[in-house]
Amino acid sequence: MAEVLLFHHACGLTAGVREFAATLGAAGHTVHTPDLYDGHVFDTLQDGVTYAEKAGFGTFVERGRAAALDLPAGLVYVGFSLGVLPAQGLAQTREGARGAVLVDACAPVAEFGGAWPQGVPVQVHGMEADEIFAGEGDLDAARALVGSAADAELFLYPGDRHNFADPSLPSYDRAAAGLLTERVLAFLDRLT
């Protein structure tokens, strides 16, 4: 089974993120969920983003890198929204990455290096009308990634919600989250 390093979104390590990790764990995968916010959890995306901005987004990425140091190299990196930054950065730069799943966000590949690494499959998931994912360049970055990487998939879901896969937030979309979970489990099974 796969070993996964899962990074939470800007609201923190919510009950919904923990639930997603538990679902992967129940399927036999080993899942690590570092708390990059030191216990802080926010009810709104804006409050979480404000916290991340005060700490600095680079701090968030560095905490993610530090969380990976004591773990084996052969990880699948999963990130939700802001958590995509450390997940994508590690998938692109840490030797031995087995795969990546990027949810609600995607940075340009050039942000972390010249090209997506050979042999590292990636999935990107987002809502087609999410003003952050679709309106701030993430969707364009995801399309460019899929167009340049050998094993990359982009899954667009109907709707306009950000953090749609977290059942502990009001933005939760049960149907889209269920489909995302099925696709991620199939992806992880393919890697084992």
Show the residue positions of the predicted features.
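Short beta-strand/loop motif that positions the catalytic acidic residue
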Residues: V124-G126, Y157
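Short beta-strand immediately N-terminal to the catalytic nucleophile in serine-hydrolase-like folds
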Residues: Y77-G79, V103
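Serine-hydrolase catalytic machinery in alpha/beta-hydrolase-like enzymes
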Residues: M1-P72, F164-A165
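A conserved short beta-strand
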Residues: G96-C106, P121
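Gly/Ala-rich beta-loop-alpha elbow adjacent to hydrolase catalytic centers
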Residues: G79-G83, A87
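Conserved alpha/beta-hydrolase "acid-adjacent" motif
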Residues: E131-D140
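Short, proline-enriched alpha-helix->beta-strand connector loops that line the catalytic pocket
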Residues: W116-V122, S148-D151
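C-terminal catalytic histidine-bearing segment of alpha/beta-hydrolase fold enzymes
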Residues: A149-T192
